[in-house]
């Protein structure tokens, strides 16, 4: 059957009788976003791009959030020298100059802008044209090149198929060419600088207007969201049933601190102890509670130099309270409720000493990773210590469904082939070689970040590696700023003050720089940033180490998932080497704990279609090959690997 016959049969299926069997490649389709059905506009566009020998796109709006998920595919097309023409507009000054510059930087793409002001007319086209031989696949409908339009919005598009001589293709391509060659259409060099200036003026005006409408959080009577309401309801039931222990399992960034504060307010507990393992976190938690309670209860710290023992609500570090001079300030019934943050550590001796001292009405544990624990008590686990009373559980997948987290764009990128599992000293020079550093910087610049500057965390295999890579980064000019990168290595020997200073510098804006303190671009670390660190501004996470467990992988990915103003998404760059545990990456991302090899393979191929919301998952071809080899070799019955 030739292509014309295939096309006739496809049209019969689409327009006359849906029961007629035909080749889906030649069948017109309705294209929308519904991840539960494995459908995303983005995935369809990606597939067509990878098959075509030429593409043309005409859309009103282009943003970084829209093109970032396509960057890996577009880079592959550049390598194959597949030509592309992209036409956009200055309508409403909405398209982001940063995105336009990124597209224009690809050697195979020609970018033009239609000037609606000069033409004195609107521009609302949303069309994607893909040519393969003599056949055109054309997607027309409602989707611009923006993040939500391509992944999660309610969008209606149709994919039509036509030969190059078909009337539909002829008319659409003719119209594209008319706009492309219009006197009101300008090449990148002719429009970019003027448009960038106009865009920045309009953006500044919008930002000012937005700020005028914002009222500080402290002026609101904060109310719990749906997740927090469900948690409080379940917690009440547990207490009413006579239980005195409960566990909240909540993915990083979903608001478990506020959930606990709302619960304490709802339950009317007069005295509460909140235990954390970092002084910075104690201070942050206290501020969150103050927003919920305002001045209805007194609050104090027992950490660092603070000794505010008699406050109604005490926020303490485990390390401080574990010492007798502080612990013995309290009798066993001093608190109505004791909250244990990062509760997967409660099996450790330091926590157990505190737990044996107190007898509150309620022990409340909170963790994102209950299956990760300190095995200091033989046979005990976190669930058992909280009497298997789970007040609420929300894992990464559900949190994304509920839009509680910042969307992420994950890219599995091939690490240099010289990197293997052996991290002995003789391999250290390879891990920190100039070639690898160049590779990392090239990819981090290409895939970028959301916002005005990079605020990144880089996870390495060893302390020595963090120090050497940070040193090398600091001697290399950042192509975006024209200045050398500003990074530090932060590890276990860093003081509380050093950590706090590093976190503040990473969050700083360029205009806040002074002679005493400069902003940071990256913090290098091994493990100390895995948990208990809330830097909401993080917009890029780079993984330079093998994945040892799905739990640690999600902890490190989670460092970038907190929402923040001006942060539309976070970019996750995972440099994948020849590691035997590569199969853990799709297991971690999918949340699928069936350990079915076919399911894991399928996620590598189709994860981008089924991940909730605006988040996306991409693996380059070599990374896919390495993961598939790892899956084939792995023994999923060996629980130690899981």
Model-derived regions, located:
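Walker A/P-loop
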Residues: 240-264, 278
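Conserved helicase ATPase core of P-loop NTP-dependent helicases/translocases
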Residues: 283, 300-301, 306-307, 326, ...
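Conserved segment of the helicase C-terminal RecA-like domain
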Residues: 550-555, 559-589
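Long, largely alpha-helical accessory region at the distal end of helicase-like NTP-driven motors
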Residues: 191, 198-224, 235, 439, ...
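PLD/PLD-like phosphodiesterase catalytic module centered on the HKD motif
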Residues: 1-225, 229, 344
């Amino acid at each position: 059957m030739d292509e014309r016959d295939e096309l006739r049969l496809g049209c019969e299926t689409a327009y006359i009788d849906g029961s007629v069997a035909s080749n889906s490649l030649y069948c017109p389709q309705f294209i929308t976003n519904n991840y539960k059905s494995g459908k995303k506009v983005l995935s369809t566009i990606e597939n067509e791009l990878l098959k075509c020998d030429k593409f043309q796109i005409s859309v009103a709006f282009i943003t970084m959030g829209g093109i970032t998920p396509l960057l890996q595919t577009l880079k592959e097309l550049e390598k194959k020298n597949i030509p592309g023409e992209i036409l956009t507009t200055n309508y409403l000054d909405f398209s982001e100059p940063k995105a336009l510059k990124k597209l224009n930087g690809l050697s195979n793409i020609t970018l033009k802008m239609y000037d609606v002001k000069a033409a004195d007319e609107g521009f609302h086209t949303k069309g994607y044209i893909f040519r393969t031989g003599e056949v055109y696949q054309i997607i027309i409908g409602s989707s611009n090149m923006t993040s939500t339009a391509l992944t999660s919005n309610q969008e209606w598009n149709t994919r039509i198929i036509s030969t190059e001589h078909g009337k539909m293709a002829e008319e659409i391509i003719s119209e594209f060419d008319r706009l492309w060659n219009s006197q009101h259409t300008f090449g990148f060099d002719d429009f970019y600088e003027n448009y960038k200036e106009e865009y920045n003026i309009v953006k500044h005006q919008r930002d000012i207007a937005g700020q005028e409408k914002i009222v500080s959080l402290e002026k609101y009577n904060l109310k719990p969201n749906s997740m927090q309401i469900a948690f409080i309801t379940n917690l009440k039931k547990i207490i009413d049933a006579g239980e005195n222990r409960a566990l909240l399992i909540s993915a990083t960034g979903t608001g478990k601190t506020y959930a606990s504060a709302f619960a304490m307010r709802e339950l009317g507990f007069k005295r509460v102890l909140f235990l954390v393992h970092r002084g910075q976190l104690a201070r942050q938690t206290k501020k969150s509670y103050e927003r919920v309670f305002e001045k209805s209860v007194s609050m104090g710290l027992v950490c660092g130099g603070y000794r505010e023992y008699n406050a109604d609500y005490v926020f303490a570090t485990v390390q401080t309270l574990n010492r007798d001079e502080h612990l013995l300030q309290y009798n066993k019934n001093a608190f109505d409720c004791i909250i244990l943050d990062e509760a997967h550590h409660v099996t450790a001796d330091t926590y157990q000493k505190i737990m044996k001292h107190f007898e509150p009405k309620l022990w409340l544990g909170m963790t994102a990773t209950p299956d990760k624990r300190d095995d200091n008590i033989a046979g005990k686990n976190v669930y058992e210590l909280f009497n298997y009373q789970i007040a609420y559980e929300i894992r990464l997948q559900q949190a994304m469904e509920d839009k509680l987290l910042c969307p992420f764009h994950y890219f599995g990128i091939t690490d240099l082939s010289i990197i293997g599992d052996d991290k002995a000293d003789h391999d250290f020079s390879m891990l920190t070689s100039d070639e690898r550093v160049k590779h990392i910087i090239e990819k981090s610049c290409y895939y970028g970040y959301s916002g005005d500057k990079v605020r990144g965390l880089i996870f390495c295999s060893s302390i020595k590696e963090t120090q050497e890579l940070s040193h090398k980064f600091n001697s290399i000019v950042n192509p975006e700023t024209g200045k050398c990168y500003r990074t530090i290595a932060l590890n276990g020997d860093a003081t509380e003050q050093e950590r706090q200073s590093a976190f503040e510098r990473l969050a700083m804006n360029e205009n806040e720089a002074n002679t005493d303190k400069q902003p940071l671009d990256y913090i290098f670390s091994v493990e100390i940033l895995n948990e208990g660190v809330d830097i909401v501004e993080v917009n890029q996470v780079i993984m330079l180490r093998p994945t040892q467990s799905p739990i640690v992988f999600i902890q490190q990915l989670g460092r970038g998932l907190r929402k923040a103003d001006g942060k539309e998404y976070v970019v996750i760059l995972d440099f994948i080497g020849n590691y035997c545990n590569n199969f853990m990456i799709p297991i971690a991302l999918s949340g699928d704990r069936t350990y079915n090899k076919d399911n894991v393979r399928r996620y590598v191929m189709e994860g981008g279609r089924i991940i909730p919301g605006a988040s996306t998952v991409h693996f380059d071809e070599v990374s896919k090959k390495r993961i598939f080899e790892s899956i084939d070799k792995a023994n999923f019955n060996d629980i130690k690997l899981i």
